[in-house]
């Protein structure tokens, strides 16, 4: 499972290099979460998750506040949450989550990104069965044993705990996201190195260099699309 954490790290690193894009995507996601429920994260669990994730990407406070105020103001801009599934080079599997205010624009753009980069879109369910929805929480300066002790004291069950880069990485069911964070916060943890609700591949594949290069171009093309929020895959990209 350690490889899966590396894919999240690589994804964070690539997005950190495109701060304006990641901020825009978070702004949209925060707006949608606040508009669909209460604009208060304490009474809106979906919004609370997005805000916790935003912290790990250092999203500026003004962007967060602007998105919430936009939702409070009754803005009429509506977004649909869409999921596309497809295949990359050598049968690699990809899931694309989007937020769009124009479905007729998004689907052709995603299909074109696949088609121009050695991939093809599949039907709903064609690859999702090979992924597990997972909460991933990273805590710096804790060993796996220390993290386990904290979680056991809080009576929180998780799937797995790994150690990497001086951090304990906790994998849990999505509905345990807040419980895991609260357990650590009550133990004095103030910041998290990662706080994600993600789709983790049940097994990963390694691509030859030429296919890997094409695969990375495909992922870049998908992530560059304005409506795309998240891209998940089952390829081991290495260090």
Swiss-Prot record:
GO terms for biological process: regulation of DNA-templated transcription. One of its GO terms (molecular function) is DNA binding. Belongs to the TACO1 family. YeeN subfamily. This is Probable transcriptional regulatory protein YeeI. It comes from Bacillus subtilis (strain 168). PANTHER family: TRANSLATIONAL ACTIVATOR OF CYTOCHROME C OXIDASE 1. SUPFAM superfamilies: YebC-like. It holds the Pfam family TACO1_YebC_N. It comes from the Bacteria. HAMAP family: Transcrip_reg_TACO1, Transcrip_reg_TACO1_YeeN.
């Amino acid at each position: 499972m350690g490889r899966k954490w590396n894919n999240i790290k690589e994804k964070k690193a690539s997005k950190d290099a495109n701060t304006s894009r990641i901020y825009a995507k978070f702004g949209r996601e925060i707006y949608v979460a606040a508009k669909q429920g209460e604009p208060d994260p304490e009474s809106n669990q979906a919004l609370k998750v997005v805000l916790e994730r935003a912290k790990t990407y250092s999203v500026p406070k003004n962007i967060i506040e602007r998105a919430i105020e936009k939702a409070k103001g009754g803005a009429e801009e509506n977004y649909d949450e869409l999921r596309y599934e497809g295949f990359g080079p050598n049968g690699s599997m990809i899931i694309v989550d989007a937020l769009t205010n124009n479905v007729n624009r998004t689907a052709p753009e995603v299909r074109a990104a696949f088609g121009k980069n050695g991939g093809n879109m599949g039907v709903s369910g064609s690859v999702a069965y090979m992924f597990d929805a997972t909460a991933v929480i990273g805590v710096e300066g804790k060993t796996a044993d220390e993290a386990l002790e904290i979680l056991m004291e809080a009576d929180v069950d998780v799937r797995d705990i790994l150690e990497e880069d001086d951090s304990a990485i906790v994998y849990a069911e999505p509905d345990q996201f807040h419980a895991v964070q609260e357990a650590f916060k009550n133990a004095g943890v103030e910041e998290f190195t990662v706080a994600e609700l993600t789709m983790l591949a049940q097994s990963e594949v390694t691509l030859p260099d030429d296919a890997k290069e094409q695969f990375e171009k495909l992922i870049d093309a998908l992530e560059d699309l304005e409506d795309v929020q998240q891209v998940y895959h089952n390829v081991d990209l290495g260090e």
